[in-house]
Amino acid sequence: MITVNTLQKMKAAGEKIAMLTAYESSFAALMDDAGVEMLLVGDSLGMAVQGRKSTLPVSLRDMCYHTECVARGAKNAMIVSDLPFGAYQQSKEQAFAAAAELMAAGAHMVKLEGGVWMAETTEFLQMRGIPVCAHIGLTPQSVFAFGGYKVQGRGSKAQALLNDAKAHDDAGAAVVLMECVPAELAKKVTESVSCPTIGIGAGADCDGQVLVMHDMLGIFPGKTAKFVKNFMHGQSSIQAAVRAYVAEVKAKTFPAAEHIFAD
């Protein structure tokens, strides 16, 4: 079974980590069998599964239900579950109560969004036995504050994002996830923190990559984000597509130049 120690050893060895979102047991089992090391039960389910316009309406009850489903299908992969909007920002104690519910539902790690200001919560959780993935850069729960889905950390804002990563690393975060961050900055962050980094739209130099399942399978019609690749092209099955994703992450051929953001 993949553990926090496994991820640390992979970072040290330069072996890339493959992560995908999963929301139910059958896909979790398929991804697990295909060699995906980490399964993210993301609040992205609000958009991908529930058909909502953002992640904000997703409840803790929703997250626990889908975590239970994924846990029934996964045998080897690490399960990371999102703390949903409103379930952890009020206080460290509120965050612990919500995280404990997700862990009881089958999560091995919880993910929270936010920079330096959330590092205290990261420390509070990890000191109480709950591994934390700290999500920085573009944090979808703050999309309205950002004014849309925009690249974060460009120009003069680069140092602030680096500070966010270091604060969570110092607080004991098990993983730092960066979304929509210039590739060179993501590389600098990866080299500056002791914990593994996972990127989505953050270049090829992170310690691992993550995509939303529906994106990598080409399920969403119309225009997709720059960092998305449809791995179903040329494949005869979903499992083959997932294996292709894992292989390209491991070989460092995904993300390619067309999937990354410059400063």
From Swiss-Prot:
Catalyzes the reversible reaction in which hydroxymethyl group from 5,10-methylenetetrahydrofolate is transferred onto alpha-ketoisovalerate to form ketopantoate. Mg(2+) binds at residues 43, 82, 113. Keywords: Cytoplasm, Magnesium, Metal-binding, Pantothenate biosynthesis, Transferase. One of its GO terms (molecular function) is 3-methyl-2-oxobutanoate hydroxymethyltransferase activity. CDD domains: KPHMT-like. 3-methyl-2-oxobutanoate binds at residues 43-44, 82, 111. It is found in: Cytoplasm. Pathway: Cofactor biosynthesis; (R)-pantothenate biosynthesis; (R)-pantoate from 3-methyl-2-oxobutanoate: step 1/2. One of its GO terms (cellular component) is cytoplasm. One of its GO terms (biological process) is pantothenate biosynthetic process. This is 3-methyl-2-oxobutanoate hydroxymethyltransferase. Its cofactor is Mg(2+). HAMAP family: PanB. Belongs to the PanB family. InterPro entries: Pantoate_hydroxy_MeTrfase, Pyrv/PenolPyrv_kinase-like_dom, Pyrv_kinase-like_dom_sf. The active site is at residue 179. Homodecamer; pentamer of dimers.
